[in-house]
A protein has these predicted regions:
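Compact, glycine/acidic-enriched structural inserts
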Residues: 116-135
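Intrinsically disordered, low-complexity regulatory segments enriched in Ser/Thr/Pro
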Residues: 107-114
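A surface-exposed partner-binding patch
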Residues: 1-105, 137
Length: 138
């Protein structure tokens, strides 16, 4: 998938225009750097997110008000065996929420309030997550 074209299409939607939700892209992550990050963190990212990172390291929206995809060096791997058998990856945020990737057998995206602890299901896939962001639902 060409993520830039997909996201530009999302910014042209009626809701994105009404909410002035724009997008800024970054240079791609080199595959060797991404593989090194995965090995260091003992995580293999879902193909959908890997393919995005290989096209753009981050995604800024609303002129810095939202970061649907933080630059890779700002991602946090959260390991809490009491809460989840698999690690979570904090990869995006807005002023009110942090976005977490569940790395279990069915990777999904959850969100939690920035100053809260209860996560809630947000999207089943990365592309659905981006659709919700650009509809102003993040």
């Amino acid at each position: 998938m060409n993520w830039r074209h997909h996201i530009i299409r999302l910014t042209e939607s009626e809701k994105a225009r009404a909410g002035k939700i724009d997008a800024s892209f970054f240079p791609p992550v080199e595959e060797s750097r991404l593989a090194e990050w995965e090995q260091k963190n003992e995580i293999y990212l879902p193909e959908e997110i890997r393919s995005y990172l290989l096209q753009s390291e981050g995604l800024e929206a609303q002129r810095g008000e939202a970061w649907p995809v933080l630059p890779l060096d700002q991602w946090d791997v959260l390991r809490d065996e009491c809460a989840s058998a698999t690690p979570w990856v904090h990869f995006g945020e807005t002023a009110s929420h942090r976005y977490l990737l569940s790395t279990g057998h069915s990777p999904s995206i959850y969100r939690c309030k920035t100053f809260g602890s209860n996560e809630e299901f947000f999207a089943a896939t990365f592309s659905r997550y981006l659709e919700l962001v650009f509809r102003g639902e993040a």
